[in-house]
């Protein structure tokens, strides 16, 4: 199965609507970056993901360090990823990193990076 995983920071205070918007930013950013990339493997994964109903899993990380560590692992494995920074117009300071999106990619590649995290 091909899936997308969004990792949300649980150490910062965000309302439910704010958190939902940040998760949406991560998902949309990932899809746009794949469409605009020249990576044929990523595009194959995107097409499979779309055909499979766009499975998304949202999990939580306890710190910014966890987000950075997992983004580096995704980068090392050449997986699509996006780090979302808040614009700072409502609840958070500008530039606050709120979440990390990884995928769409095969679950056997994503699970070693995010499989230990708890569902949000």
From Swiss-Prot:
Main location: cytoplasm
Cytoplasm among keywords: yes
Enzyme Commission number(s) from the entry: 3.1.1.29
Gene Ontology biological process terms from the UniProt entry: translation
Top EC class for this record: hydrolase
Catalytic activity: an N-acyl-L-alpha-aminoacyl-tRNA + H2O = an N-acyl-L-amino acid + a tRNA + H(+)
Gene3D superfamilies for the chain: Bit1
Cytoplasm recorded as keyword: yes
NCBIfam families tied to this protein: arch_pth2, PRK04322.1
Role noted for this protein: The natural substrate for this enzyme may be peptidyl-tRNAs which drop off the ribosome during protein synthesis.
Record's protein name: Peptidyl-tRNA hydrolase
Organism: Saccharolobus islandicus (strain L.S.2.15 / Lassen #1) (Sulfolobus islandicus)
Taxonomy of the source species: Archaea, Thermoproteota, Thermoprotei, Sulfolobales, Sulfolobaceae
